[in-house]
Structures are given as structure tokens and as C-alpha cells.
């Protein structure tokens, strides 16, 4: 039957069709919407209306079947586009169902078919959208089972240990039912154990770049068998911190590999990832409009530097209302530790699979700070406040990091203080709140931070503390997100925390109480005071080394900070009591902004009544008039002349309110800048650059404002119409001075050989720095590759790597294990080496063999025990083992019969001893 034909036999013979398909008795309503009147035509014997009747019947039947399928209750209806339609094997589909995935997410639906088709893919989607499963599912489908040939086939590189652990967890869950071997190679773990893992011929390697490069150099690994490479959080991996490691790793990978790049923040241009070796990649960018979850409520508080600790305590106590003291999960764990009734097996199972009731509570909060010194300081401060706190940062010991994160996941602690090491990849269940104690310097870091909450359809809140110095970064974030900037309580009716960037101050009285408590604590506790001083020094270094904001945002920030809405009470505090706080803030602002009409010289001269002071009074009046004239001219120069030159700060605060303000009548809707999709030309029009440009525009008159030389009918811009410059700048890979490919390409010059040996004209000198330890100037190149003055050696790719990577520990490990030549790639694996890496689903069992107990004639099982003794004696006689001792222990007797190799070895040793003694034989003496 063709696709255009329709079978009506089931409708004509409904009972028979039902009996053939399903014999189970079930109640079913008759399709009431099926119109059978079309068959009861008066002219039914004619042929004129036959085709129309059939068409109407078929249409009615199809409509009824569609309604029937949608109205089925308690019965599942398979929809198109699921995992079943992707051609996955049965074991993998069972693992996906067991994991809880029913319908693939958009990134999985777009990516998995491309990966199974052996295409290179660059994928970007929001945090929490299932990117990890998008590359793990096709990897397991392609690798299928363990290969007996030596050589790993899959490699997943992650920028942090926590993200690698999260990926390992997903691989274990989705790889259940297969015998694939997977290893985790991260820093902080024992190198000797990882030597054993790699010797066991794993199929999948999940690693961080530093430790994997160390093992590659130390073990001289051959990566020619790698077929599947994944760069997770690719924009972070390709930054300057991992440049040397990736160069060496990529050099060893084969050209025929399949390369995948995934991250939540990726630019459109793939030039920055050219070193990854992509071959005709497919770019999949989803959710570019909604870069953060629509269920996330974002709040931005303006604070002063001295009030940050008090503002943090105010948020925790009064806004989030985090309870102090020990948590319920902590009490339960302490009671179990005291009682000791639970067995070791039960404790181990609870650690591996925490109870859902012991997961983080609704008060669970992550606090992001700038440096590890801030982590120590804030954790100690909150612990003194009575909160249950965990902490983690990059240089913390791996075991300690696991314990701290596990305490937060299981609910033993309510607060987790971390650096940006936890901004990518840590999947904390039921996380409600994120606090940015130090505002991020890049918009994409903010996206990764707040992406820890509001996942899987749950609501979440993010609170950010913004100082005056952080205002340019806030405006960069506003441009990146393409949202409206709402300041203070002036527009509290229209403020939307999920769709706007709402900025405002905090309640002065509450902050004052918290700041007073912090000051008292610092005076009493010398340890916390020392931690604060160290954190302040680390903050100075962090501010000097962080990426700078855009010039336009820095210019706009001056007007934004000077506005009244910057310090106005935040719309979040919308209650009756806050109205008094608003009036109090206004009064304090009036008092603080009071300026007397006359100077002290004029007031004292008038009071004195002396004639000699008239000259000083006249001089001060002239100076004041001159200053006022200059100030008025400066204000006139800064004012925009046209509607298109309105500052972006004022424009952003009024977006969406044009109809209310009357702008909709005078201004076309297309003239309003859409910050989410702003092109280069729109950015040039939106932002006024300098005052002299506005003066030149005044002179040009209406000629420039009326139109340009561009004919909109024929003009073709060099950038796409939907190109957002601010968005691409936020997604770009930031790596020190070379933060942009365009800027780096400008510095590139043609390298021509000179005919003179001296330095060429305008050639930059090699930048040096003073090394305090060695008391000499050293090159700054070592700072960029992370070696910091350490000894370097050249790798296989020519890149300089740390000399400590070739320490000889692998040779010592082989010697201790008495291993000879390791099998090479392509050879059959050695089964004896595979015991270090268990296959998926394999259980460890005790295989210790003990001698049977002596048979007792007076017991009922005498014959059974006697038979076991005879079998043991027979086995000992076959293997050359002799029984000794009264407990039935065994010992293998050394055979004194020498083999051919033993005889040859003994002869060589004898010859060496003879040459060493250098004594002539007795025959020689006789001659």
C-alpha cells in the first residue's frame, strides 16, 4: 500500500480488527465524533458523491484516532523523535530509561544523530540542558564493548576535577550493562594507582589536561588508537592556562579522530578553536536568546567595599533566611557515628547513593568568591555566625574537596563557599540560591555561576553584590543578556526579576547591624583578622589581573553610579516598613548632597563687617561664576543632540516603557536598540563616544541625522543582520593579553629574514620580570605556560613542558610490580594487567583459599571433610606444594633443578667474577 492510500478495513470490521490486535477485555467508549451520516446519502447508489463520501469518512476517522490516542489515560503513547528513533542498542536504551531520561533535550536531539554520523560537532546550550549525555550516549553506542586490543578509544578532557567526576558518574550510569572500562585521571590522586589504571587497557579516559599530560609523558603513551575526543567546557580548556598541555596532547592524537566541543558559552566564530583540529564541523547553538534559565530570578545589590561582609550576612539571615546551627542531616550523621550500629556495608552504600531526603534543602546556597584566600576568610566568618559551611577551591587536596562537596550534597552543610572552580559542571540537586560575593569579570562566568540553580524546571534565585568599581562589568552583563536595566524603586510595578537586570541598594539599618557585628568579631578574633588581611592582598592582585571591561561600559558606568537609582532601595524590599526607609534614604541623600551658597571667606567677611574683606568676597564670586560657566558648558557638551544618541544607560532603563512615556508616538519601534541582537552599526549609533563628536554633529545639522550614503535597498553589511557584537565579545575565549582573535591578528606581522644580525626597527624587546627567589630577571614566557620559572623540557610537539613530568616514577612502579615490556597499541592485552581496572558492572568477590578443617570422626560430616582433605592433598601433589604446620598452611618448596637459563646465567656470573679477580688459571702458570 502506498503512503497516499488508506486502509478502512479496520473501521468496516471493527470487532474482527480488535480481536486480531488485542484479546484482552477492556472497556472503551465508542468514538462519538465519528460522523457516519455521510454513508446514509439518498443517492448512495450513484457514483457522483462516492469519492467525497470516502474522503469525508477517512478524514473523520483520522481525527477520531488522533483524539483517541491523546485521550488515553494510564497508557503511554510513543512519540517521534525519542531515543528509540536514534538507532541505539537495547542495553543503552535500558540505561537511559533507568537514568530517568524519557525524551531527549534539544541539544541531545540535534547532536546525537550528527555524532553517530561521524561528524565533528561544536555544541552550545544552556547549563543544565543535558550536554554531558549528548556526547556520552553516542560514545557508548560507538564503542559498544571492551576491546582486547591495547589502546584507549575515547578521551574526555575537562577543565576541573569536579566536572571530570560528574562526567564519570554519567558514564557509569549510562554504561551499565556493558563491559567498557573507564578510568578517571585527575590531579591529587596517586600516580601509582593511575599507572595501574592505564596498564589495564581502559576504553574511556576522563581526565584533566595537566594530569593526563603528566601520564602521557611519564608513561610514553601512544594515543594513535584514540577515535573519539571530547573537549568539555571547551572555551575554558582553550584559554591560556591550558595552552601548553593541549598543544602537547593534540600533537599525539591521530588526524582521523572525531572531535567534539561542548560548552554553555561558545562564540559563533570557531577560529579560536582552530588548534582542536576540527574537520568540517557542524555548529549547534541552542538557547542563544535565553542564555540563562527563564526560571531564575536575578537580584543585584549595590554595596560599598567596607559593607560586603555585612551585606552577605544580611542576605543569608533576612533574605534567604538560612537557619543557623547544625542541620538535620548533620545530627543524623553524628548520631550514627556515636551509636555505631550501622554496618560498614550500609555506610558505604549510603555514601555512594545518598538518600534523596538527605539532599540539600531549600536553604542550600553557593557563595562564589574571587580567590582561595576569600574562601578561607568567608568560611571562617560564616562559621562564627553559626552557619554550617563547606568550602572548596582549586589547590585544596582532592580528598578534602570530595568530603566538603559531599557534605553539601547530603545536607550536612547549608552553605558552600567556592571559587570559580565549581562554576562549571557541579550538579547539586535542589540548589535554590547562588550568591556572587565578588562580581565576575566576564559575562560567561556569570552564566556558569547562576547555571548551578534553576535546573530541570525548578525555581532559583541569584544575588550579586555590585560595588562602584564593578559597575562596568554589570553593564557588560546587561548588554550580553540583552535585558532591561531597572534601577531602584522608581519602576517597581514593571520590574521583573526573571527578565530584567534590577539594581538597587539594601536596607541601611540591617546592614549597619551586620557590619557592627563583623567589626566586633574582627577586633576579638585575631585569626579572622589575619585572614581578612590576606584576602585583601589577594583581591588587589585579582583586580590587577582580571579582564578589563569594555570602554563604552566604563563610560556609561560613571553616569549610572552618579544617578539616584544606584543607591535607592531595591524593589525586592517591597513592604510598608520599607517606605520609611525610602524617606530616610532621601533625607540622608539631601543632607549628604547639601552645598552652601557661599564659601567660608564670604561668610566670615560679612560677619566681621570689615571693608578690607570686600576684595576677597568679590574674588570668590568671580571664581564661582567662572566655574559655573565651565560646568554648564560641560553639561551642554555631554547632552545628546538627537534621539539616537541617548546614552545607553537611560535608554536601557526605559526599554519597554515607550508607550507609557509617550515615546511610541515620536519614535519608530525599529529605532529602539534591541540589546539582545545589537549589530555593530546599532552599537555605534546607540553609544555616544566623545564630546567633540557631538560638536561636529551640531555643525553638520540635519544632513547627517536625516540619513547616510547607505541605500537600505542595495546596501550589504559586512556583518550578519542578527550579529550581536556584545554577545560574541562575551562568548570569546579570554586568554590574557590575547583576549580577542581580531586583536591578536592585528599584532601578527610577516616574518622576513633580515640581512643584519641586530634587532630590527620597532621590534619589541623580550619582556622580563624580577624573580625574587633566584635574584635575577627571567622571561615572562614561563608565566604564560604556567611553569613560573621551573625547569622546562621540549615535548614531542616542540612545546615546552615541565621537567617534572619525566621523573622516572613509572619505571620505578614497573620495577616494583616486576613487569617487563608493556604491550603496545594494537597488540592483544595482557589479562594479568587488567585486574586493576574493573569492567562496568563487575563485582569484587573474595577469592582467598583456606585449608579445610581436620576431619573429626565423632561429627556427622566426617566423610565430607575427609573428602575435602584428600582433594587438597591431591592438588598439593600436582602443584608441588607441601603441607606444613598444624593449621594446614601450605608452602611452595623451591626446586633445585636448574633450567637452561639458570645455567647460562650462572656461567656469566662466574665469568664476571673471574675477570674481576684477574688471576691467571693454574694452566697458565704451568706454561
From Swiss-Prot:
<dbReference type="GO" id="GO:0005829">
    <property type="term" value="C:cytosol"/>
</dbReference>
<dbReference type="InterPro" id="IPR014001">
    <property type="entry name" value="Helicase_ATP-bd"/>
</dbReference>
<dbReference type="InterPro" id="IPR012541">
    <property type="entry name" value="DBP10_C"/>
</dbReference>
<keyword id="KW-0547">Nucleotide-binding</keyword>
<feature type="compositionally biased region" description="Basic and acidic residues">
    <location>
        <begin position="847"/>
        <end position="877"/>
    </location>
</feature>
<feature type="region of interest" description="Disordered">
    <location>
        <begin position="819"/>
        <end position="927"/>
    </location>
</feature>
<dbReference type="GO" id="GO:0005524">
    <property type="term" value="F:ATP binding"/>
</dbReference>
<feature type="region of interest" description="Disordered">
    <location>
        <begin position="326"/>
        <end position="363"/>
    </location>
</feature>
<feature type="binding site">
    <location>
        <begin position="125"/>
        <end position="132"/>
    </location>
    <ligand>
        <name>ATP</name>
    </ligand>
</feature>
<feature type="compositionally biased region" description="Acidic residues">
    <location>
        <begin position="39"/>
        <end position="54"/>
    </location>
</feature>
<feature type="domain" description="Helicase C-terminal">
    <location>
        <begin position="348"/>
        <end position="502"/>
    </location>
</feature>
<keyword id="KW-0539">Nucleus</keyword>
<feature type="compositionally biased region" description="Polar residues">
    <location>
        <begin position="351"/>
        <end position="363"/>
    </location>
</feature>
<dbReference type="Pfam" id="PF00271">
    <property type="entry name" value="Helicase_C"/>
</dbReference>
<feature type="region of interest" description="Disordered">
    <location>
        <begin position="683"/>
        <end position="711"/>
    </location>
</feature>
<feature type="short sequence motif" description="Q motif">
    <location>
        <begin position="81"/>
        <end position="109"/>
    </location>
</feature>
<keyword id="KW-0067">ATP-binding</keyword>
<keyword id="KW-0378">Hydrolase</keyword>
<comment type="similarity">
    <text>Belongs to the DEAD box helicase family. DDX54/DBP10 subfamily.</text>
</comment>
<protein>
    <recommendedName>
        <fullName>ATP-dependent RNA helicase DBP10</fullName>
        <ecNumber>3.6.4.13</ecNumber>
    </recommendedName>
</protein>
<dbReference type="Pfam" id="PF08147">
    <property type="entry name" value="DBP10CT"/>
</dbReference>
<dbReference type="InterPro" id="IPR033517">
    <property type="entry name" value="DDX54/DBP10_DEAD-box_helicase"/>
</dbReference>
<feature type="compositionally biased region" description="Basic and acidic residues">
    <location>
        <begin position="627"/>
        <end position="636"/>
    </location>
</feature>
<keyword id="KW-0347">Helicase</keyword>
<keyword id="KW-0694">RNA-binding</keyword>
<dbReference type="InterPro" id="IPR000629">
    <property type="entry name" value="RNA-helicase_DEAD-box_CS"/>
</dbReference>
<dbReference type="InterPro" id="IPR027417">
    <property type="entry name" value="P-loop_NTPase"/>
</dbReference>
<dbReference type="GO" id="GO:0006364">
    <property type="term" value="P:rRNA processing"/>
</dbReference>
<feature type="domain" description="Helicase ATP-binding">
    <location>
        <begin position="112"/>
        <end position="284"/>
    </location>
</feature>
<feature type="region of interest" description="Disordered">
    <location>
        <begin position="1"/>
        <end position="54"/>
    </location>
</feature>
<dbReference type="GO" id="GO:0003724">
    <property type="term" value="F:RNA helicase activity"/>
</dbReference>
<feature type="short sequence motif" description="DEAD box">
    <location>
        <begin position="232"/>
        <end position="235"/>
    </location>
</feature>
<feature type="compositionally biased region" description="Basic and acidic residues">
    <location>
        <begin position="893"/>
        <end position="904"/>
    </location>
</feature>
<feature type="region of interest" description="Disordered">
    <location>
        <begin position="627"/>
        <end position="671"/>
    </location>
</feature>
<dbReference type="Pfam" id="PF00270">
    <property type="entry name" value="DEAD"/>
</dbReference>
<dbReference type="GO" id="GO:0003723">
    <property type="term" value="F:RNA binding"/>
</dbReference>
<dbReference type="GO" id="GO:0005730">
    <property type="term" value="C:nucleolus"/>
</dbReference>
<dbReference type="InterPro" id="IPR014014">
    <property type="entry name" value="RNA_helicase_DEAD_Q_motif"/>
</dbReference>
<dbReference type="InterPro" id="IPR050079">
    <property type="entry name" value="DEAD_box_RNA_helicase"/>
</dbReference>
<keyword id="KW-0698">rRNA processing</keyword>
<dbReference type="InterPro" id="IPR011545">
    <property type="entry name" value="DEAD/DEAH_box_helicase_dom"/>
</dbReference>
<dbReference type="GO" id="GO:0016887">
    <property type="term" value="F:ATP hydrolysis activity"/>
</dbReference>
